[in-house]
């Protein structure tokens, strides 16, 4: 038996591993889950932030990082299948932004 939070974490890991098999640079990105964004959206972000990407900071020893926000993502899904699909799409979007690619290039099956 796993909690909802553990199942959500597993969905993020699965999406990241799936992308890393096809896009080796994804292996260099650290993935994390947080409950909610720590601040209000930046002016360029949509009203509710589902995920954020942070570039690597080699001087500080910090790898590139993608954070997926569990509550905003989970609140948009009505069932487990929708949740899995949405988590995958948010991970793809964030990875695409970090790699300077379109989401369709990263994962052709995730086009909106």
Predicted feature residues:
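A metal-dependent hydrolase signature that marks the N-terminal structural subdomain at the beginning
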Residues: 1-58, 64
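DNA-recognition helix of helix-turn-helix
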Residues: 93
């Amino acid at each position: 038996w796993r909690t909802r939070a553990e199942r959500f974490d597993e969905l993020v890991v699965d999406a990241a591993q799936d992308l890393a098999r096809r896009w080796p640079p994804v292996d260099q990105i650290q993935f994390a889950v947080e409950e909610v964004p720590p601040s209000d959206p930046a002016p360029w972000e949509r009203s509710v932030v589902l995920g954020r990407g942070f570039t690597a900071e080699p001087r500080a020893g910090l790898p590139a990082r993608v954070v997926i926000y569990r509550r905003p993502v989970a609140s948009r899904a009505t069932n487990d299948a929708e949740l899995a699909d949405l988590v995958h799409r948010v991970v793809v979007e964030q990875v695409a932004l970090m790699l300077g690619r379109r989401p369709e290039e990263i994962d052709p099956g995730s086009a909106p």
